[in-house]
């Protein structure tokens, strides 16, 4: 079993996505669906984080970044084995270029 840690930035990005759908799109069904699927995905990361693929970018792949889909969004995370942790770093919409953000944060291979 893995311990799932949601970074403050990822929490805020998830909150922002929910607020956008609620206030701008005025779609309570989509809000509930996103919240439910996000919770389910985070819960599933506790037992099977390796089932999610590595990011497509070769540099990010070498650094162990993976992504887990949540409706039209995705959690970006890394797995550590000692201790068994999943660190969820970001929550991006599918249209966002997450590569730029992650490469700027990345310490290198």
Where are these regions (language model features)?
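Enriched for short, Lys/Arg-rich terminal
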Residues: 70-74, 78-109
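Basic, Lys/Arg-enriched alpha-helical interface segments
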Residues: 1-64, 107-109
């Amino acid at each position: 079993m893995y311990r799932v840690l949601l970074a403050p930035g990822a929490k805020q990005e998830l909150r922002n996505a929910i607020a956008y759908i609620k206030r701008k799109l005025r779609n309570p069904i989509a809000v509930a669906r996103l919240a439910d699927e996000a919770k389910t995905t985070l819960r599933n990361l506790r037992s099977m984080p390796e089932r999610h693929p590595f990011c497509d970018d070769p540099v990010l792949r070498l650094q162990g970044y993976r992504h887990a889909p949540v409706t039209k969004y995705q959690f970006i995370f890394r797995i550590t084995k000692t201790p068994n942790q999943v660190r969820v770093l970001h929550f991006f919409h599918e249209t966002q270029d997450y590569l730029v953000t992650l490469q700027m944060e990345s310490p290198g291979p």
